[in-house]
Amino acid sequence: MLSVKVFFQKEPVFCISLLLALASCLLVHPDWDYLAYPDYRTLALLFCLMIVVAGFQSLGVFALLGRTLLRMARSVRRLSLMMVALCFFCSMVITNDVTLITFVPFTMLVFRMIDRPERLVRLVVLETVAANLGSMATPIGNPQNLYLCTSSGISMGQFARAVLPYAGIALVLLLTVVWIQRDELIPDVTLYGGDEDKKRKLLPAVLPFVALLALCLLVVFRVLPYLPVLLCVAAVVVALDRSLFRSVDYFLLLTFLCFFLFLGNIKRIPEISNVLTQLVSGRELWAGILASQVISNVPAAILLAEFAQDLPTLITAVNLGGLGTLIASLASLISFQLFARDYPEKKGVFLKAFTGWNLVFLLVLSAAAVVLTGL
């Protein structure tokens, strides 16, 4: 019983999605139509992107980038600006959760080395906000964007109009908040040596993963079919580093699969489907933001997409909905867990700062959404 409780605490969204899927199977008995429920293209892309990013991470690409930028910093303010900007822009390509897994521990290490740990709470919170909001700017920045873009056939122009204005506002807000903090010089710190030699050795090793990332992007833009790219990625990883298969978040894939099963069954129950359509249609902005606060933005995107008429507004909503509560974005939970592991005595301080700053950004960006969408 204890192991079940521990597993639920570790994978709450998967457990909830599994229970919903199983419950829906009691209402719609399993048949061959179940095979048509999943969006196999989205699942294949998620798998490919996770394994490609794991390849970059295993080669130390992101840590090397962080150290390179660190050497350019001369003050706490400048260092903080660089780290927040790094999280914002990296999340567009390597996703928000991988960005935080990579750079939050690096940030904590650096601020301990310069003897400024008291600055960490606000900076890690702002890095989390930056990763969540930066990831909204591209179709591959987070799972909800990937799903909504691949399953709906929305054009890149529509997608850009749905996210780029808010990403721009968010970047200005983030940099302003960091800039107004008290500044001070930081001492010279030697983090690691031999980076120039590492860069020379890194290039040939990283090229195959760059090529695989390019293939994934061509699938996102519907230039290539997903199945040949999936097989190509799997073959290259088998040849280069089979251990990367262990880096894939299979519970995220299973969570998507469970939600596809749940939603496929719900659509076959006219009474429930009609009610959800009436609740969501025309209210995509608030439905997406509010649902994200309770079930997090990835499940909210999968659930609401089936009943929404205005998909661009829903894309805006579930991305802004990643702000707010700690569970609104699963990437935020990653930051909290990483911080709490090193500073367990400051968990309450972190949660207070996290909630405060997230509400500020959510209110400002929601107001911008009301103005820009004319709601």
Question: Which ranges hold each PLM region?
Answer:
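Long, contiguous bundles of hydrophobic transmembrane helices that form the permeation core
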Residues: 2, 172-233
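Interfacial loop-to-helix junctions that mark the boundaries of transmembrane helices
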Residues: 4-10, 32-42, 154-166, 197-202, ...
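Cytoplasmic-side transmembrane-helix entry/capping segments in multi-pass membrane proteins
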Residues: 11-15, 40-41, 67-81, 120-129, ...
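Transmembrane helical segments that form the transport core of multi-pass membrane transport proteins
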Residues: 37, 59, 63-66, 211-313
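Membrane-interfacial loop-to-helix junctions in multi-pass transporters
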Residues: 40-42, 71-84, 113-123, 203-207, ...
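Short helix-coil transition sites and intra-membrane helix breaks within transmembrane domains
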Residues: 54-60, 90-102, 134-142, 289-305, ...
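Hydrophobic transmembrane alpha-helices that form the pore/transport pathway of multi-pass ion
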Residues: 83, 89-136, 147, 302-316, ...
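C-terminal transmembrane helix pair
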Residues: 160-171, 286-375
